[in-house]
Amino acid sequence: MCPAATPRVKVPRPRILFTSVFGPYAQDDEYGSRAINPMELYHNQVTRAQGPFSLRMFHRSWGLMMLRENISAPNALLDFPTLERFTAELRREKYDVVAISAIPPNYLKAEKMCRLIREIQPEAEIVVGGHISGLPDIQQRLGADHVVRGEGVRWFRRFLGQDENAPVHHPRILSGVGARTMGVRLGEKPGDTAATLIPSVGCPMGCNFCATSAMFGGKGKFVNFYETGDELFREMEGLERDLHVQTFFIMDENFLLHRKRALRLLELMKEQNKSWSLYVFSSANVLKSYTIEQLVGLGVSWVWMGLEGKASRYHKLQGADTLDVVRTLQAHGISVLGSTIIGLEEHTPDNMAEAIEHAVSHNTEFHQFMLYTPVPGTPLFEEHKEKGTLVDPEWANGSDIHGQLRFAHRHPHLPAGTEGTWLLHAFNRDFEVNGPSILRMAQTALRGWQRYSQAADQRIRTRFRREGARLPVDYAAAVWAVGRYFRTNDGVARRAAELLEQLRAEFGLKCRVASTLGGRWLLRSIRREEQRLARGETCEPPTFYEKSADFLTLRTAS
C-alpha cells in the first residue's frame, strides 16, 4: 500500500492491542491448529524426526514487538494467548485498535478473533497483517478495517499521523524461549541465548516461491532498517549492553548480500575488538563471494542456506557447489542449517529418493525440509492460479497447507497424497544417516576449536574459546549418550565413538570423567523424554502480556 493510500486512525492517541493468534497450537482442532504444525520452528520443520533429540523452543512474535517499539501510542502486546485469555482482554480493557498478526494456516483463528472484536468492542478498528495478508479477498473475508501487506512500521506511523521516516528503535529480544533438548532445559542465564536483530526485511533475490520476498515487494526489493555498518554496529552495541549478549541471531533473509554494510561492520568489529558471534541467513553464491577469512572475522558461526538440489534453477545457487560450500564452512567451525524443498517441478517418483540422498549427503548440522508450496501472494501462487492447478484457489480451507503435509497444487509428476510420505522419508533418512543434530554440532564446534582456539588474532581466539567452552563437558556427555542410544545404528555409533575419542584426546581427564558420568545421566533423561513423547505430550508457548509505559499511566489515571 502506498503512503498516500494509508488511512488515518479514527481517534486521537488511540489505545492499541497487538496480538498473535490464539493457542493451543500443537493439536488438531476446529480452528485449524494441527499437531503436525506446532508453534516451534525447529520441531515443526527442522528436527521433526529426531524424537527426544529434537531441539524444542519458541520464538516470540518479533514483528509485533518491532511495531510497538516504533510508535507513540498507549499499547499492549498479547503474545500466544489462549482464546479465553484474548476474550478476557477484550472484556477487561477498552481498545481503539486491535492489530492481529497471522499466517495463512491460521485463517480460522484470525476469523474467530475478528468476530469477537466486533461482538465485544464494535467501535475498535481491526488491523490485520503478516503473511495472511496474501490470501484472496482477505479484508472482506475477515471483516477487517485494514490489511497491511509489507513493512508495518512505516504503515503504522502513517496510520497514527507520525513521522514514518523517524529512526527505527530495535526492541530488546532474546531469540528463543524455553529451549530444551534430550529432556533438558538449556541455559537461560544472561548471555546464554542470542539476541534477535532485524536489520532488513524482504529479499531481492525474488525466488518465485518465497513469501517473504513477495511480502516486501518481490525481486529487487527490500527494506533496510539500518542502511550502514555504522548504524548496525551501534545497535549491536546496545543489544550487547542491555541483554548481556555476544551472540546475535540476525533475522535478515540474505544478510551478507548487503556487502558494503557487512564489510563495514567487520571493520568496526576489528577496531573495537568485538568477538561477536553471528547467526545469519545467506545464499550459497553470496557466501562464495566472501573469503573464509572475512566470514570468520565477521563472527559468522551459523548459516541458514538453501540446498534446493543439483539441478536447481534458482539464481541464488547458480555457480555454487553447495557440498563444497558446506564442507568449507564446517572445516572452519561454522555450523550450517541446510534447507531443501521437496516437490520441485522436476521431482518425480523415480528421482525423488536420489534428490533426498543428495540433500542428506551435505550432513549439515540441521536440515529443514519443506514442501514446494504456492503460498498466496507469491508469483508461484499466481502461476498455478493461471494454469488452473491450485487445489483450492480461494484458500477456503488452508489449515493443512503449511509445508509439512500436502501440496496446495496438483504436482505434474508426484501423485497427490504421496508428498507427505516423501517429506517424512527425507527427515527420517537425514536422522538415520547423520544422527542427531547435537552430534553434528559437536563435531563442527571441535573443528573450530582446533583451528582457532590458539589463533594469533585475539578477537577470533576469544570467540572460538567461548563457543567451544561446552565441548569438554556438555557436548562430550551428549556424544557419549548418542553413542549408547544408537548402538544398533553402526554408522552413527561409529561417528559418536570417533568424536568422543577426539574430544577426550583434546581435553583430557576432565572430559573423560564428564563424558561418562554426564553421559549416563543424560541417557536416562533421553529415555524419559522418549516416554513423554510416546504419551503424546506436546509443548505450548507461555502467554506474554506486555504494556507500554503510557498505557500503564492511562490505566492508573482511569
Question: PLM features: what roles do these ranges have?
Answer:
Residues L67-A76, D242-L243, Q272, T328-V336, ...:
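A structural motif corresponding to the C-terminal end of an alpha-helix
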Residues M1-L41, R91-D96, H402-S558:
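Radical SAM enzyme core and accessory elements
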Residues Y25-D28, G134-I138, G218, K260, ...:
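Flexible glycine/acidic-rich beta-alpha junction loops that bind and position SAM and/or redox cofactors
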Residues Q139-R158, I292, G297-V303, E354-F369:
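Structural recognition of alpha->loop->beta junctions
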Residues C2-H244:
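Acidic, low-complexity intrinsically disordered segments
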Residues A179-L337, I342-L344, D350-E357:
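Radical SAM [4Fe-4S] cluster-binding motif and immediate context
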Residues F18, I100, V128, I250-D252, ...:
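Conserved beta-strand positions
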